Amino acid sequence: MLDESQNIKNSESLTFRSAIRLQSKHRLVLTGTPIENSLKDLWAQFHFIQPDLLGTENAFQKQFIMPIRQGNARAKVLLQQLIAPFILRRSKKEVAPELPALTEETIYCDMTEEQNTCYEQEKNSLRNILLQHPQSTDRLHSFSVLNGILRLRQLSCHPQLILPDYTGTSGKTAQIIETFDTLQSEGHKVLIFSSFVRHLEVLAEAFHERGWKYALLTGSTNNRPSEIAYFTDQKDVQAFLISLKAGGVGLNLTQADYVFIIDPWWNPAAESQAIARAHRIGQDKQVIAYRFITQNSICLLYTSPSPRDCS
């Protein structure tokens, strides 16, 4: 059995190749996020448990991935019919009907004037790249565009993520601090997720300045159990700063009753998994999840239905 089987999603990775070589009579995979990035993730996991079902990777790309991207409903239905007999899915409603309700809200944040200036400068640079080579398929050009999009996402969070000398503030950071301040004064515990470690570091600095205790979990954390225990066992540690990749799965943190998603991710399944660290079996409090979105920024695209349609 492969637990957290989405980790073999890259068919070119050593993890995938090692898993495929395992010898066994029966194979199972267990995951809460079967699709993290694209439908290729699904192919990789089915290639492990039932190699012939979805054909080769190239055939799967032509028969399903491309047609589904183009809105072919028939291809989507066919794929669902093929994999349905091999999937046993349980939902919280079925196994834990007593679980308190989950409330999800979006908090929209305005940029500060200085932050907006940095954002507009970067946006103009990206626009110039696109205008100079509107039809280019060159890999270097594509990399420049993707890097520009990433920088816009980071600037919409806080310019310090990419501009070390920036001394101004961030509208989103101010809103996060204000919201947390209210919750911690009421005795709540909060999980704060970000896909950018630097974003967590900026928040950690702000928390330290205010004398707020916090736990921090990223990919470079040496002692995960210690950080987890610090948050769960200490009543006055009311914030747990967690990178989405390092702590989005595999943690039971029902001591928290609030979850902050402080920068949006295009795949809602990854965010749902993060929220499920608190909203899970064993939780006896209502859980409220806040998504912080910067107004007039590229992050608004990450909340629209089309790029997040992984169903």
Regions found by a protein language model. Name each.
Residues Y302-S311:
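Single conserved hydrophobic/aromatic residue that forms the stacking wall/gate
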